[in-house]
Curated annotation (Swiss-Prot):
The first C2 domain/C2A does not mediate Ca(2+)-dependent phospholipid binding. Keywords: Cell membrane, Cytoplasm, Cytoplasmic vesicle, Membrane, Repeat, Signal-anchor, Transmembrane, Transmembrane helix. Homodimer or homooligomer. Homodimerization and homooligomerization do not depend on Ca(2+). Interacts with SYNCRIP isoform 2 C-terminus. Binds inositol 1,3,4,5-tetrakisphosphate (IP4). Binds to AP2 in a Ca(2+)-independent manner. Interacts with STX1A, STX1B and STX2; the interaction is Ca(2+)-dependent. PANTHER family: SYNAPTOTAGMIN (PTHR10024), SYNAPTOTAGMIN-8 (PTHR10024:SF249). This is Synaptotagmin-8. GO terms for biological process: acrosome reaction. It is a single-pass type III membrane protein. The gene is Syt8. It comes from Mus musculus. Signal peptide: none annotated. PROSITE patterns: C2. Gene3D superfamilies: C2 domain. Belongs to the synaptotagmin family.
Length: 395
């Protein structure tokens, strides 16, 4: 009985006694069992393992390269010089290595607070003209952002002034505009180039941003120059002002109606009397249509608020010039033009921008203040300035 029990117990223990060797041999066969259970061919598994290894090695190499690069960068000497504005300011060639204006940090000194201006100067001894290229400005001083534009003039030509277009929302405008001034060689030593930068305000006084006064007698004009110049504070002496005129423009392409609303004027000479505004349309440099406002007496800020409608087909917009002129009776009891504003494809600066805004926003009135310019200067531009192609408004 005991033997039978032992035999039964032995037979009962046999499965457990053989389980130990089975567990011992299960470890080495675990990986092959997993491989056989994956429903992929073996060559795809080998490729996946190889790709993972290459990716891991690449990551390690990238980490090592970044560490070496930072280590070398820290050990570079800091006494190396870079190409800056000082070395290029007195250069006499146009092939200058100029840094990007946006990368220049303003210095703590007072000389840097008004910004910089990049100019190119070229004098033609044959035509006796100096060609001024207004390239760009940088680091202009303003609260927040600004809408800068520039006036360019030469002291020997009173009343002659070039006005750039307005650049919206920037302190580093790219002008890229060129203007010419007639300066005989005998007048070069005493001539001064003046560039004034302004912050455009549509319905208020424009704010000065800085000024450059460059005596041409100190510049070597035997070669083409392109240099950076430091802007100074705005001058205390204001340029000759003939007043300002505010009016709105509205164009409807479907009907071809151009509406001009003369609103008001300000800053007129106190010695003038009975001021009024003439509106004149010119087609192909010939007088086409005209009208005028009522006269306002005894005021330097006359208020008109009078509207005028002209029929101008879309096909004739490229050939039309709009001239608004303030007339007044002076001390000699003779009515003369005080100043003019030219709009159209022959205009420049703010008037050209106003005309373009009218075409871009058809059927909507666009109002703006404009500085009056010399009547002689406007008449000269009408005769000489080539037309600029403008986009036609959508009907």
């Amino acid at each position: 009985m005991q033997a039978d029990r032992s035999m039964k117990m032995g037979h009962a223990l046999n499965p457990f006694s053989t389980s130990a060797p089975l567990d011992a041999t299960a470890g080495p066969s675990l990986i092959p069992d997993l491989i056989t259970r994956i429903p992929w061919p073996r060559w795809t598994l080998f490729i996946a393992i190889l790709a993972a290894g290459v990716l891991l090695v690449s990551c390690l190499l990238c980490v090592i390269c970044c560490y070496c690069h930072r280590h070398r960068h820290r050990k570079q000497p800091k006494d190396k010089e870079t190409v800056g504005l000082g070395s290029a300011r007195n250069s006499t060639t146009t092939h200058l290595v100029q840094p990007d204006v946006d990368c220049l940090e303003p210095c703590s000194g007072g000389d840097q607070q008004w910004g910089r201006l990049l100019l190119s100067l070229e004098y033609d001894f044959g035509s006796q003209e100096i060609r001024v290229g207004l390239r760009q400005a940088g680091n202009l001083k303003a609260e927040g952002t600004a809408d800068p534009y520039a006036w360019v003039s030469v002291s020997t030509q009173s009343g002659r002034r070039h006005e750039t277009k307005v650049h919206r929302g920037t302190l580093s405008p790219m002008f890229e505009e060129t203007c010419c001034f007639l300066v005989p060689p005998a007048e070069l030593p005493k001539a001064t180039l003046k560039v004034q930068l302004w912050d455009f305000k549509r319905f208020s006084e424009h704010e000065p941003l800085g000024e450059l006064q460059l005596p041409l007698g100190t510049v070597d004009l035997q070669h083409v120059l392109e240099s950076w110049y430091q802007l100074g504070p705005p001058g205390t002496t204001e340029p000759e002002q003939m007043g300002e005129l505010c009016f709105s423009l509205r164009y409807v392409p479907s009907s071809g109606s151009l509406t001009v609303v003369v609103l008001e004027a300000r800053g007129l000479n106190p010695g003038l009397a009975e001021a009024y505004v003439k509106i004149q349309l010119m087609l192909n440099q010939r007088k086409w249509k005209k009208s005028k406002t009522s006269s306002k007496k005894g005021t330097t800020t006359p208020y008109f608020n009078e509207a005028f409608v002209f029929l101008v087909p879309v096909s004739q917009l490229q050939s039309v010039d709009l001239v608004l002129a303030v007339w007044a009776r002076g001390l000699q009891l003779r009515t003369e033009p005080v100043g003019k504003v030219l709009l159209g494809s022959r205009a420049s600066g703010q008037p050209l921008q106003h005309w373009a805004d009218m075409l871009a926003h058809a059927r909507r009135p666009i109002a703006q203040w404009h500085h009056l310019r010399s009547p002689r200067e406007v008449d000269r531009v009408l005769a000489l300035q080539p037309r600029l192609p403008l986009l036609r408004p959508r009907s």
